[in-house]
Amino acid sequence: MVNMKALMFLTFAGLVLLFVVCYASESEEKEFPKEMLSSIFAVDNDFKQEERDCAGYMRECKEKLCCSGYVCSSRWKWCVLPAPWRR
């Protein structure tokens, strides 16, 4: 009877240990993609958006002039592509 109790205890302890190891491994796997994506999409100082003197496509053109290739829409006050049907 003593051997049966010891065997059950060791089996239970082994299952608990297996659960802990699997849980730790799974949590590391969940963190890995997050770390990889954050390193890939990290904002670098070289790639920050620069402040322009002109407004780009679909930007407000009330105070800024539109960049070359765009015109200020008289109706919406946005920089849009020039087209013959626009007034």
From Swiss-Prot:
Pfam (any one): Toxin_12
Localization in the cell: Secreted
Signal sequence region: 1-24
Expression sites by tissue: Expressed by the venom gland.
A single Gene Ontology CC term: extracellular region
GO MF entry, a single one: ion channel inhibitor activity
Principal subcellular localisation of the protein: secreted
S-S bridge residues: 54-67, 61-72, 66-79
Proregion span(s): 25-52
Alphabetical UniProt keywords: Disulfide bond, Ion channel impairing toxin, Knottin, Secreted, Signal, Toxin
Keyword Translocase: no
Keyword rRNA-binding appears in the UniProt entry: no
Family affiliation: Belongs to the neurotoxin 10 (Hwtx-1) family. 51 (Hntx-8) subfamily. Hntx-8 sub-subfamily.
Reported function: Ion channel inhibitor.
Entry domain remark: The presence of a 'disulfide through disulfide knot' structurally defines this protein as a knottin.
Full protein name: U3-theraphotoxin-Hhn1a 19
